[in-house]
């Protein structure tokens, strides 16, 4: 079997690739380099002359070839390699009529625990905190056992440290009250703070027992990120913008974090993310893949989650279930706060060709 054709799709703000073989079996993948999907498409187009004619089962060889063909690295390149890798695993699963997780060593769980994204910014007003409280209660009633928010007020950069801490505490308190003590809460900072402020804030909210405190600072320095993990008493998570096994190795070797957060659509696909999971396992660190870009990357993440021992919970957005994704046909089944281990061959996602070709491309406004 050989790779015969590669189709690219820019739909909504996403880049999706379809790899078609001479046997008629096709696979789909998606990049998580969501700020620059056109650039990812340009790289995939450059890779076509390398890929066409290749055996799609030679996944590791292709992954290494694409990574090392040119002496350059970066998230756009890795985002392109990642979506190709996911599509190749999809082809392999379909050919052998088995789900991808079975090709990764088999399953170690029958369902995947989710943590629900309740939203990015809730602000600092009483009414918004009341809304957060109600949203948390509803999510728990729907069966979710872990909830995630960005707790910082939207004007965080204009506040004194005292104001920032007090208003963030108020928001976290509303989340904890709505969620109750039987539900885990997760706090995502989106790289907004300095190391000094991060440490102070993390210590101030530890009374609410967050599961972890995620991405407090910019990704510029691995050493600085690891240093925070050593200074605070609540678990730290980061890694969603990293794109190689070596970055994760150095992050962990420098003392942190307790949770690693690769994105399967950015960190080298299923092939490299599985390696990152093993590196993390050797440090007694858990893998919680970053994910909010739709059913393709949710499915790719779930196949990894099912096959590794050091999984805790999977990031999940209800946007996966919205009509906006009607150009994708998903076999994933959510029951309350869990996705049932998929049994369909391959990834379990198909493209609706009639619809995807009509979906407009709406790139992210970088001025927003």
Question: Which stretches of residues belong to each language-model region?
Answer:
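Metal-dependent enolase-superfamily TIM-barrel catalytic cores that perform enediolate-based chemistry
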Residues: 111-226, 231
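C-terminal extensions of enzymes
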Residues: 325-368
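Shared catalytic-loop signature of beta/alpha-barrel
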Residues: 42-49, 61, 203, 220-338, ...
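Conserved, mostly hydrophobic/aromatic
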Residues: 24, 47, 84, 97, ...
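Glycine-rich phosphate/pyrophosphate-binding beta-alpha loops
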Residues: 10-14, 30-37, 81, 117-121, ...
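Glycine-rich, aromatic-flanked loop segments that form ligand/cofactor-binding clefts
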Residues: 85-125
